[in-house]
Amino acid sequence: MLTAEDKKLIVQVWEKVAGHQEEFGSEALQRMFLAYPQTKTYFPHFDLHPGSEQVRGHGKKVAAALGNAVKSLDNLSQALSELSNLHAYNLRVDPVNFKLLAQCFQVVLAAHLGKDYSPEMHAAFDKFLSAVAAVLAEKYR
């Protein structure tokens, strides 16, 4: 699935994200809520206004989970098992939403990193986010 070159590029992208995890994670959530308003239904108790403490906090959690996945590229299923259980059994999030958030995270990366986000990095990170979304959806079967 992920080649050695993909893994190298994914780590390089994540190094560029360092220090901006909360910002990028919350911006990706905001973009998802705007582009796909149906996703708001999973956050009825959140203040969904831009920059709210709850969106920033959840954005930080999203970025932390992605950071954990980057550290565990060879074993994503194990690294994301608890998160998969939470979303499948407790929160019952429709797995299509993982792909929507992944797409929004890609937009955030491209917007913030600009030329530092090469087409090769984009392709590798897209494969990574697709793998993360697939792992998070595993428990639904």
Swiss-Prot record:
Disulfides per UniProt: none
InterPro entries xref list: Globin, Globin-like_sf, Globin/Proto, Hemoglobin_a-typ, Hemoglobin_oxygen_transport, Hemoglobin_zeta
Molecular-function GO term, any one: oxygen carrier activity
Signal peptide positions on this chain: none
GO cellular component assignments: blood microparticle; haptoglobin-hemoglobin complex; hemoglobin complex
Gene Ontology biological-process entries: hydrogen peroxide catabolic process
Binding site for heme b: H58, H87
Tissue specificity: Red blood cells.
UniProt keyword list: Heme, Iron, Metal-binding, Oxygen transport, Transport
UniProt domain Globin: residue ranges: 1-141
Subunit comment: Heterotetramer of two alpha-D chains and two beta chains.
Database matches in PANTHER family: HEMOGLOBIN FAMILY MEMBER, HEMOGLOBIN SUBUNIT ZETA
Known role: Involved in oxygen transport from the lung to the various peripheral tissues.
Family designation: Belongs to the globin family.
This protein's name: Hemoglobin subunit alpha-D
